[in-house]
């Protein structure tokens, strides 16, 4: 195995291993996008609740 990463060998569309690596990279990137979107929405929801009074926040969180 060489010391440096060879992109063309790792993601070669002619080999089964290369195709598997492409599939794994695709699923990993989709998972990453999903997590980032979930985190962003969660932070947005928290920011919106800070605009209201504490009683309103509790009603929104429990309601």
From Swiss-Prot:
Keyword terms of this UniProt record: Membrane, Mitochondrion, Transmembrane, Transmembrane helix
Alphabetical GO biological process terms: proton motive force-driven ATP synthesis
Predominant subcellular localization, coarse grouping: mitochondrion
Keyword Mitochondrion attached: yes
One GO cellular component term noted in the UniProt record for this chain: proton-transporting ATP synthase complex
Membrane topology per record: Single-pass membrane protein
Localization in the cell: Mitochondrion membrane
Membrane-spanning parts: 15-37
Pfam families: ATP_synth_reg
Role this protein plays: Mitochondrial membrane ATP synthase (F(1)F(0) ATP synthase or Complex V) produces ATP from ADP in the presence of a proton gradient across the membrane which is generated by electron transport complexes of the respiratory chain. F-type ATPases consist of two structural domains, F(1) - containing the extramembraneous catalytic core and F(0) - containing the membrane proton channel, linked together by a central stalk and a peripheral stalk. During catalysis, ATP synthesis in the catalytic domain of F(1) is coupled via a rotary mechanism of the central stalk subunits to proton translocation.
Quaternary organization: F-type ATPases have 2 components, CF(1) - the catalytic core - and CF(0) - the membrane proton channel. CF(1) has five subunits: alpha(3), beta(3), gamma(1), delta(1), epsilon(1). CF(0) has three main subunits: a, b and c. The ATP synthase complex/complex V exists as a monomeric and a dimeric supercomplex that helps shape mitochondrial cristae to optimize proton flow.
Name this polypeptide is given: ATP synthase membrane subunit K, mitochondrial
Organism of provenance: Drosophila melanogaster (Fruit fly)
């Amino acid at each position: 195995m060489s010391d440096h990463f060879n992109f063309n060998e790792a993601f070669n569309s002619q080999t089964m291993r290369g195709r598997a690596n492409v599939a794994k990279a695709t699923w990993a990137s989709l998972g990453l996008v999903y997590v980032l979107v979930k985190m962003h929405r969660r932070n947005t929801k928290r920011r919106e609740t800070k605009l209201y009074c504490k009683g309103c926040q509790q009603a929104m969180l429990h309601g």
